[in-house]
Amino acid sequence: MIGEQQFPFLAEKGHVVSLVGGGGKTTLLYAMASHCAQKGWRVLVSTTTHILRPENWLWAKTDAEIQELWARGSYAVVGSPAPKGKLTAPPEADLAHWMAQADAVFLEADGAKHFPCKAPAEQEPVLLPQSDSVLAVAGLSALGHPLKECCFRLEQACMLLGVPPEACLTPELLAQLLASEQGGRKRVGSRAFYAVLNQADTPQRQLLGKQTLCVLQERYRVNGVLTQFEERERA
């Protein structure tokens, strides 16, 4: 479950929120979209890179289909069809037009190939100028595992952290990966920024998550949030 206490921007219309990282990013994206749609808001979901295609009835291709979904109290997902059951970014002018009509916009801004954590490639993330908030997501399932087993863009991650591929991911290293301006905070600038530690679904992961939150706050002055989702809620 998520709410305004964890993410204050969910209480206000007008935000454009970009999500980066791995370990539940798409699940969180749709959870936030659903939360806002349930309040009667016009919510738009899209991507600046790629996103898994949702159920067909949520995928809108025209103004009329977007308005119909909003009238039914649902969020609308927009994007151009891509291989492997994905959507890619819609034409820039179309996306800007649809964003201008929405009360809240949620954008997936990079990919992680289903790894629980990642470092960005040179061209990542793709943050729109309109985006005012960025969430860097990582899955707590990565902690305690060698980077080479749990981290997408392994070479970049090792360079950023200064460790070999065999190094186990610790709360300190995960906090560094999320808080770094070459990692989770890349290109964030003056935007609001949150580190999201997902998969906090066991006592051990919750403990490690809290340790990571402490490092984020004390060493990097970064706000962090623990989240977890039931199996039925996951994208």
Task: Tell me the role of every PLM-derived stretch.
Residues 166-187, 211:
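A short, acidic, amphipathic alpha-helical segment used as a generic capping/interface helix at domain edges
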Residues 82-119, 124:
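Phosphate-binding/switch loop-helix module in NTP-utilizing enzymes
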Residues 209, 213-235:
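Canonical P-loop GTPase G-domain recognition
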Residues 121-143:
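Inter-motif core of Ras-like GTPase G domains
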Residues 19, 43-47, 77-79, 105-109, ...:
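General beta-strand structural signal in soluble alpha/beta enzymes
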Residues 109, 139-140, 160-167, 177-180, ...:
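G-domain G4 guanine-recognition motif of GTPases
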Residues 2-39:
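Walker A (P-loop) phosphate-binding motif
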Residues 33-85:
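N-terminal phosphate/diphosphate-binding loop that engages ATP/GTP or pyrophosphate donors
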